[in-house]
Amino acid sequence: HIGNARMAVVTDLLVRVLKKKYKNVLFVSNITDIDDKIINESEKLKIPFKEVTNKFSKIYNNEMLSLNVAPPDIQPKATDHIDDMILMIEKLIKNECAYVMNNHVMFKVESYKHYGKLSRRTLEEQLEGSRIEITDFKQTARDFILWKPSKDEQPGWNSPWGRGRPGWHIECSTMSKKLSLIHI
């Protein structure tokens, strides 16, 4: 996918510049090894989801090397950090930044006054032309999934909210916080 390659090349350039200028640069780039697309592919091929992610991770990493994109210093897999994700979600709920609705845990975007600061887009601008839909487990269209229930035949982990799996956003923030030792 050209979009993935573009992002990797741009990130590689940025990391190389930062490593020239600063002594302690740690480049962490995770592998999302659990999501709906992976589960669907696993079900279609009738193979475990880990086999799907291992296959495509290897292909991706080889393609990046062929583009002369340096590998990350650390390349964690989301499923290796499920317990940390659960702890972070619990903290977000405690701080009223997340809520549980219909067996889903959602991040309450309006609870974070700086949301959109990096993109320089207001909350209203972020909805323009978006593919976001209101569902029976969201208070507002902006809110996003931190934890979603898994069907019995799908991969899942036990949590205070029932058996399920993490949403994409919590994966990145949890691993960044843990592995980069940054405060989020």
Residues covered by each model-derived region:
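NTP-dependent nucleotidyl-transfer catalytic core
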Residues: I2-H183
